[in-house]
Structures are given as C-alpha cells and as structure tokens.
C-alpha cells in the first residue's frame, strides 16, 4: 500500500498534469498589442498641415482648394485642416480668436466659408487622390458653446465650483469638459461621425489627445472605422494611444532632441536615446510624427530657422529618412521666415525657395524606397557604428532588398568618418546627385558641418 505522503504527492502531480492539459496551447505565445488597422493609403503617406486662416490671402476653403493641385504635385498625401468650427466670442483672444476655442462642433467657421465650400475642398482633394483629416478639439470648448448652457454638468469645475480652463496653461478662452459623463461621450462621438458622413472627412488630428480618457478615443475609433477606415493622429507622446485608437502620435522627444543638438545643448546621443526608446518600448505599428515646424512652434517658440539654424536642412532630411511619419507645415516649402500671428489674419508670403525642391525630391525618394515607408511597412533603423559617434548619426534601413544608408554630421565642424561594423557595406546611389558609391569597412566619408549623405540601392 502507498503511504499517505506518497498518496498526497501523487494527487498533487495528477492535479498539476490536469491543469497543464487544460491550459490553452497559446498561453505563452506573444499576443498582438495593437488591435487597430491602419488604412492602406497611409503606408507611405506624408502629412501637410493647412492653416486655412493664413494659407491664402483670402483665408478661405475656396481659395485653399485652388492650391490642392500644387500640393498634389509636391507629393503630400494627407491634408490636416486646422479646426474648421466657429470660434467662441466670450473671452476671445485677439480679433479672430483661437481656432481651438470651439463654439459649435457641428458648424463651420464663416471666416473660412460654408459647409458646401468645405465639402467642395474635400471632394477636390479626393479626386486628386488626397485625403483630408480635421483637427478635433475634444478636451475643451469655448465658454459660449451651447453645451455650456444645455449641459453644465458636462464640464469640469474648480474647488470654488466655477468652470475650469485647462489647469496651468494660459487657456483662458476655453473651459474643460468632464469625460466621466456618458452623455458627453456619446455627443462627441456622434459629432465626429457627422463630419465623416456629411463632409467625407478621412480622420482626425486630435488636440491634446492625452487630456481625454483613452477609452473614449478607443470607442470613437471603433465607431468611426465602422463607417470607413479612418486615420487618427494624437497630439500626445505615449505608446498606449496606439493600441486601439491612434495610427500616429507626436514625436515631441525627436523634435526636442534635434533642436537641442542644433543649439549646441546636446550631441547625437540625444537622438540615440529617442530612437532607442521607440524601438524598445513602442509598438512596431506606431507611426511617430517627425517634424521641424507646426502651428504651435511657429507661433510661440519661433520659426524653424530660429530653432534649427544651420542644422535645418539636415533636420528636415532626417525627418523623412529616419523612422517616422513626416509632416510639412504650410509655408515651409516657401521658406516662410515669419512667426505667423495666431489670433489675427497674417497670410503666408508665398515665394520660390530651395525648400520646395528639397521637399519634392525627398517625398519622391521616400515613396520609391519601401524601406523608408511608415510603420509597420517600412524598416527599422539599424545603427552603423562610426568613428565620430557623438558628432555623426549613421544608420541603415533595409527591407526586402531595398536599402538606404544615411549619415548626418550634426555638428559645426567637418568630420571624416569610417565604420567599424558591416550593415552599411554595399553599392549605392547618392540622393544628392545620383553618383555611384561603394561603401566598405575601409571607406572613409567626409562630411561638411551640418551636412548629410543619403545613399540608396538603385531601383
């Protein structure tokens, strides 16, 4: 007979075996984190931010519509329209107010035109093969938005019981919404769906997206995708937004690192830190929007010329050939040298500028090299170790036989570099002039201050 201890051990073993048998076979298999599907048309897309107020002398949708063929020829794919809604009057800033102080989520700002004008703009964009996303302000409204009178309980209140602008910022022209209220969530989602159905909008850039609960955005994305595949850009810098809500997010850390390098406050290590975090901590499907200018920076921090100085061309090129979703802010192609006024009419002065040719060539180059496409279609960056690692950024992006080798001298001194490992070896064509070049571990490359070399396998 078995002793009691032996019987107990046998029983425990039997239970363990039974438990293992009941365990699903994929218990330890990796599970996908990102559940949303990017629209197929975003795979190699370039974003273009259009500030209707300043884009043309007229400042209207109709005038902007006439410029769409030019934007198509430039090569951009997605037009991001800054908010199109009527602007609040109460506590308004400046003469015309901030477009981010929304008075009516279902209305069109008469400053820009009518709903028919907006629909005409979108229809023309679609005929040209472009897509249009709207800037959406879900975090707050103008003081005189009708929701304030109809649903005062949908708003945040401070310790005194008064309506509360977003804390700590000088946003006195707006008051915050309270997303603990299901009625508000339904209203806001329905308003977004209205623009997709009524005006043919293809998605949204969501202002201060991280100030609104993520579960709201995830549900809104599901309801929007049920109408048609949409593209969603979050003004936020957090990986979780990519799980089920947003295709793309702001690469604030990239922009700050590049600006610090240009100002002599950091070296290439700042970019190492950014790219390391993206590859180690962010989902591979996350599109990180890289840019050298947007409306906030231009208005409040300085033009791209002020922020990047002699490093600007290299910064622009890196935003296109490194990992990321490139953005062009209207006027960059004309080398706009001014800080555009935010609350007044201040039209861009359009002129011929080398930036236009640079953007056009970069876009064509990027589209012809799938290794440079947006996540998850493009390739990850593989660092290439060089002899000046604090001054020169060098990397390879390679996928399915397509290979791009890029070098950036991010310093004010000439550099001559060699390479100590082999991912860069190969025969290339230079982006700058089409010349052929062979790279081996014995090769040295000379780089002028703040210059770049972008080399690609011929296609």
PLM features: what roles do these ranges have?
Residues 6-16:
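Bacterial N-terminal signal peptides
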Residues 22-31, 35, 190, 197, ...:
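Active-site-proximal helices and loops of the catalytic beta/alpha 8
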Residues 24-46, 53-62, 66-77, 82-199, ...:
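Substrate-binding/active-site clefts of carbohydrate-active enzymes
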Residues 46-49, 78-83, 133-134, 203-205, ...:
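Structural recognition of the beta-strand scaffold that forms the well-ordered cores
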Residues 50, 71, 81, 105, ...:
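Conserved, mostly hydrophobic/aromatic
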Residues 289-354:
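Aromatic/acidic polysaccharide-binding cleft in carbohydrate-active enzymes
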Residues 407-411:
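Asparagine-centered strand-capping/turn motif at beta-strand->loop junctions
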Residues 439-459:
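C-terminal beta-strand-rich structural cap/linker in extracellular carbohydrate-active enzymes
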């Amino acid at each position: 007979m078995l002793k009691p201890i032996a019987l107990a051990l046998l029983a425990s073993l039997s239970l363990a075996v039974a438990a293992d048998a009941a365990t699903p076979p994929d218990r330890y298999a990796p599970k996908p984190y990102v559940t949303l599907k990017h629209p197929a048309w975003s795979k190699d897309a370039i974003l273009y931010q259009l500030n209707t107020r300043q884009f043309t002398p007229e400042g209207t949708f109709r005038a902007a519509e006439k410029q769409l063929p030019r934007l198509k020829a430039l090569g951009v794919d997605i037009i991001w329209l800054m908010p199109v809604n009527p602007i609040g009057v109460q506590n308004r800033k400046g003469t015309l107010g901030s477009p981010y102080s929304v008075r009516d989520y279902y209305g069109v700002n008469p400053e820009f035109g009518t709903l028919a004008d907006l629909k005409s703009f979108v229809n023309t964009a679609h005929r040209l093969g472009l897509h249009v996303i709207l800037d959406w302000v879900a975090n707050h409204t103008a003081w005189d938005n009708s929701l304030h009178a109809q649903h005062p309980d949908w708003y945040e209140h401070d310790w005194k019981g008064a309506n509360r602008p977003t804390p700590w910022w000088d946003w006195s022209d707006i008051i915050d919404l309270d997303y603990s209220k299901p009625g508000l969530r339904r209203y806001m989602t329905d308003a977004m769906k209205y623009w997709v159905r009524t005006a043919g909008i293809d998605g949204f850039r969501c202002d201060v997206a991280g100030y609104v609960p993520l579960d709201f955005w995830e549900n809104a994305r599901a309801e929007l995708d049920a109408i048609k595949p949409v593209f969603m850009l979050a003004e936020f810098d957090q990986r979780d937004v990519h799980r089920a809500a947003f295709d793309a997010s702001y690469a604030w850390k990239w922009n700050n690192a590049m600006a610090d390098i240009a100002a002599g406050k950091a070296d290439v290590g700042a970019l190492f830190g950014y790219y390391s975090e993206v590859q180690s901590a962010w989902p591979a499907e996350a599109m990180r929007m890289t840019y050298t200018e947007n409306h906030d920076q231009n208005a409040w921090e300085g033009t791209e010329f002020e922020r990047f100085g002699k490093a600007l061309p290299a910064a622009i090129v890196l935003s296109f050939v490194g990992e990321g979703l490139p953005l062009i802010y209207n006027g960059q192609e004309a080398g706009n040298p001014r800080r555009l006024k935010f609350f007044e009419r201040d039209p861009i002065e359009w002129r011929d500028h080398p930036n236009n040719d640079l953007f056009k060539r970069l876009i064509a180059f990027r589209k012809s090299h799938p290794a440079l496409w947006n996540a998850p279609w493009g390739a990850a960056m593989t660092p290439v170790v060089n002899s000046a690692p604090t001054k020169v950024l060098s990397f390879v992006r390679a996928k399915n036989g397509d290979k791009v080798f890029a070098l950036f001298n991010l310093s004010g001194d000439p550099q001559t570099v060699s390479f100590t490992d082999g991912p860069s070896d190969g025969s290339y064509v230079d982006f700058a002039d089409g010349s052929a070049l062979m790279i081996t571990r014995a090769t040295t490359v000379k780089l002028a201050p703040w210059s770049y070399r972008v080399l690609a396998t011929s296609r």
